[in-house]
Design a protein with these regions (language model features):
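Catalytic residues for metal-mediated phosphoryl-transfer on nucleic acids/nucleotides
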Residues: 79, 108-109
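Short cationic amphipathic helices and targeting signals
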Residues: 77-79, 119
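DNA replication initiation on ssDNA origins
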Residues: 1-76, 86-89
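Short secondary-structure junctions
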Residues: 18, 109-112
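Short beta-strand-to-loop capping motifs
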Residues: 81-83
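Short, solvent-exposed loop/edge-beta patches enriched in aromatic
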Residues: 49, 105-106
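A short, contiguous, amphipathic alpha-helix enriched in charged residues
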Residues: 85-103
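Short, conserved phosphate-binding/catalytic loop or strand-edge motifs used
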Residues: 113-119
Length: 119
């Protein structure tokens, strides 16, 4: 799956979209875009230039304000499954099994699963 396809799948279909660049020692830089295509292009360019690039999971009503009272839409539900020593699941395999059972038991649609790699 490419970046544009991913972003179109997880982001709402209206509002302004935000990219945030956070590099060590620098103030975060945010940029607003009217389309997911422009957001994806900017993120890819910023990444190619060696930046740490993030995107906001919500869209916003107006440019310039990435705050809760300016949120237009949020299109995703996030569930954090902690795995590892001292966490609810001993490893990712057990955490994934519990997640899949939860999805089956609740009737939620098939998810997109992302492993952050740090439990």
């Amino acid at each position: 799956m490419n970046s544009l396809t991913f972003l179109k799948r997880v982001l709402p279909d209206k509002g302004f979209y935000v990219s945030i660049i956070i590099n060590e020692g620098d103030a975060p830089q945010q940029a607003f875009f009217p389309t997911v295509e422009e957001l994806a292009n900017y993120c890819l360019m910023a990444d190619k230039n060696g930046n740490n690039v993030y995107y906001a999971v919500s869209s916003f009503n107006t440019k310039g304000k990435r705050k809760q009272d300016n949120v237009c839409l949020t299109n995703t539900l996030f569930l954090d499954v902690d795995c590892g020593d001292g966490k609810p699941y001993a490893n990712q395999k057990k955490g994934l099994a519990a997640l899949l059972k939860f999805i089956q038991d609740t009737g939620l649609p098939a998810p997109m699963i992302v492993s952050s790699g740090r439990g």
